[in-house]
Amino acid sequence: MPMPRIHLTTFIQSPPQRVFDLVRHLSLIKKSVLGKHESIMSSAGSTMVSNGDTITFHAKHLGKMRSVMLRITEFEKGHKLTEEQVKGDLMNYRHEHFFKQIDNGTIMIDIVEYDLPKDFIGKWAGKFFLREYLEKIIKNRILIVKNYAETERWHALLG
């Protein structure tokens, strides 16, 4: 059985390099975390994650604090960024961001594949909760990046 997949395509009226840099900017990643019981930490030595860096998300779900650590495993400046789970409740998690230049901006493609634990809780969470939750977080992150990239707000982060 194939892993569940989320595929989102977004037009952003901004150059690919700017969009790429905003996607990996820690302050925007932090803004995209939805709830008051959610936070992130990163191993990045600067304000932007790079190849090999980790990002750890902490969130309270189903009455329990949970952590997911992602590592940047693919990094093609201005073209592709991939985050993969190193530690967490899922069996697998992979989020690929692709950036395609077009005449009037960038097409950003987000592809997320994940695999749930095979136990009852994993199946239940996947059926009633996880896909919707992941889509909500990813769409929120896209909206924030788009808002910064298409306005003058990007200057405050990227100079």
Language-model segments: residues:
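A short, structured loop/turn motif at beta-sheet edges
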Residues: 15-17, 74-80, 98-107
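Short, surface-exposed coil-to-beta transition loops
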Residues: 5-7, 65-69, 92-95
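Beta-strand elements of well-folded, non-transmembrane domains
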Residues: 12-14, 61-63, 74, 89, ...
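Generic structural detector for well-ordered beta-strands
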Residues: 7-13, 58, 71, 98-100, ...
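Glycine-rich portal/gate segments that line the openings of hydrophobic small-molecule binding cavities
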Residues: 40-87, 140-148, 154-159
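Beta-strand/loop substructures that line and gate deep hydrophobic ligand-binding cavities in soluble
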Residues: 84-136, 156
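Hydrophobic ligand-binding cavity/cleft-lining segments
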Residues: 1-46, 50
